[in-house]
Every structure is written in C-alpha cells, then in structure tokens.
Amino acid sequence: MKTVYEIQQFLKQYGTIIYIGDRVADLELMEAELKELYQSQLIETKDFQTAILILRHEIQILRDKQS
C-alpha cells in the first residue's frame, strides 16, 4: 500500500466503505477501522503499520493546509 486509495480498496475487501464527506474524518475513521481489524488479528502487522503511517501523514498534510 502506498496511497489512501489503496487503503480504501484494502478496507473494501473487508466490507468497509467509508465516506462522510469530510476528508479528515474519513481518514480518521479508516484509521479506527484498521485498528479494529488489527486487534481482531485479521490483518498483518506490516499492512497495519504501513496503512496507519500513510493515513496519519495525509491527515497531517490536510490539517497543515487548514491552518
């Protein structure tokens, strides 16, 4: 996984589609969903870490733009 789109496609494999309309909220919900999948041991550590890193980076970029 290298992009937010790839994370969305990854989550879709588990039946999760997230769209609220607020990009930051969408990313935060994706992060929460990934945590749930990881804690349920449905995804591997590497996938979890990579996805969380990408999401947090994107959230930071969006928050910096809003400031």
Predicted regions and their residues:
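Short, structured secondary-structure boundary patches
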Residues: 11, 40-45, 66-67
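Short, charge-rich amphipathic interface segments used for partner binding and complex assembly
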Residues: 26-61
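Short amphipathic alpha-helical interaction patches enriched in hydrophobic/aromatic residues
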Residues: 15-18, 38, 63
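Charged low-complexity stretches with an acidic bias
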Residues: 1-8, 56-67
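Intrinsically disordered, low-complexity segments enriched in polar/charged residues with Gly/Pro
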Residues: 21-23, 29, 66
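N-terminal acidic leader/helix
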Residues: 1-24
